[in-house]
């Protein structure tokens, strides 16, 4: 699938890139499903349209990671790769919008890029430091948003209390994370009006915008999906039918499906669940050691 997914390749950098991607209209549910089915049959133009119509959402998700000292253009580029991966794997018959599925992949690619890009000196070597790394910026934004009105200053002690860590650990990590990229916060014109990210947000569909803001849910869902993809087809089928289905198969039905006994079906279910827990714990450990430990 060919697409210019690198914001830094545009002569006007992010300004021109944001203007360009907002020229691509949003798709209705019917249009999205029709294009997805065409893409499954090999229509690359349909796949290109699915990608371009959702590029603005990649920018919004990337903006959430702006405090990690990495250029926004790099974060957006990685998010775009995640979007294209999602388009390749999207099933229009599952009953969800593409962006609701794609946000898992977008976040996963961005987070993996951040982990690879940060040196151990900045990121820290312990699990507690890694957790603080991914929690600090988000927690500060939450406290500022729900604090004493717009522009409220949040001190280190408030953040430390929220994260249940020492204030000295927060100060140390903030020093490591110095040098955030504010290019999207800059006003778009000389009159100091809306910022670039405001321009992107204004064109977003409300329901998808709300979904994209649910960072924690998106993160966990992305890890669950990635863990499922590491199972073999039979294990994945067992988990989907016995755990994730609204009307789960009975062990008897599962055994009949594969042609073996109820007891054998039970044994395979236990094995599939154990493997899924191990895979999910390994993935969650990258960003949330506590969640990973809970699975052990």
Curated annotation (Swiss-Prot):
Gene Ontology MF annotations: DNA binding; sigma factor activity
Pfam families tied to this protein: Sigma70_r1_2, Sigma70_r2, Sigma70_r4
PROSITE patterns hit by this protein: SIGMA70_1, SIGMA70_2
Keyword Transcription regulation: yes
GO BP field: DNA-templated transcription initiation
Keywords: DNA-binding, Sigma factor, Transcription, Transcription regulation
InterPro entries referenced in this protein's UniProt entry, alphabetically: RNA_pol_sigma-70_dom, RNA_pol_sigma70, RNA_pol_sigma70_r1_2, RNA_pol_sigma70_r2, RNA_pol_sigma70_r4, RNA_pol_sigma_r2, RNA_pol_sigma_r3/r4-like, Sigma-70_Factor
Its biological purpose: Sigma factors are initiation factors that promote the attachment of RNA polymerase to specific initiation sites and are then released.
Protein name per Swiss-Prot or TrEMBL: RNA polymerase sigma-B factor
Source organism (scientific name): Stigmatella aurantiaca (strain DW4/3-1)
Gene assigned in the entry: sigB
